[in-house]
UniProtKB/Swiss-Prot annotation:
Function in brief: May be involved in spermatogenesis.
Membrane topology reported for the UniProt record: Peripheral membrane protein
A biological-process GO annotation: spermatogenesis
UniProt-annotated stretches for the region Interaction with GGN: 24-109
InterPro entries per UniProt: Ub_USP-typ
GO CC annotations, alphabetized: Golgi apparatus; membrane
UniProt KW keywords: Cytoplasm, Developmental protein, Differentiation, Golgi apparatus, Membrane, Spermatogenesis
Protein name: Putative gametogenetin-binding protein 1
Record's subunit section: Interacts with CCDC159. Interacts with GGN.
Upper taxonomic lineage: Eukaryota, Metazoa, Chordata, Craniata, Vertebrata
Tree of life domain: Eukaryota
Cellular localisation: Cytoplasm; Membrane; Golgi apparatus
Length: 109
């Protein structure tokens, strides 16, 4: 089975419009933790951050398990429902990386 690279649209709070938004390719076997780490480097973020997936059926889903891989495939949805795992990230979705403010607060939802 061949690993495919995927790139995701990145949403950055506080930046209205980027002429060419940051784009980074990831493998389906990369973990959410690796994705967050690479995006922080790409954006030069120093503070604590959290990663959201936008555009899912739930609307906005916080990705809290850094060990989960970026997976798409048959059977994953069934496992997700049984084990309450986050749904897989698809290319059509947007990732939102939030950084904790200087006062230690998260941006308002």
């Amino acid at each position: 089975m061949k690993e495919e690279d995927s790139s995701f649209k990145l949403c950055v709070p506080g930046i209205v419009a980027l002429q060419s938004p940051p784009n980074k390719a990831f493998r389906s076997t990369d973990t959410v933790g690796f994705l967050e780490s690479e995006l922080k480097k790409l954006l030069g973020m120093q503070q604590e951050s959290r990663l959201w997936k936008l555009g899912s059926q739930e609307g906005r889903e916080l990705l809290t398990r850094p060990e989960i891989t970026v997976v798409e495939g048959e059977g994953y949805e069934v496992q997700r429902r049984l084990r309450h795992l986050p749904s897989p990230i698809s290319v059509a979705q947007c990732l939102l990386l939030e950084e904790k403010g200087e006062m230690g607060n998260w941006p308002p939802e």
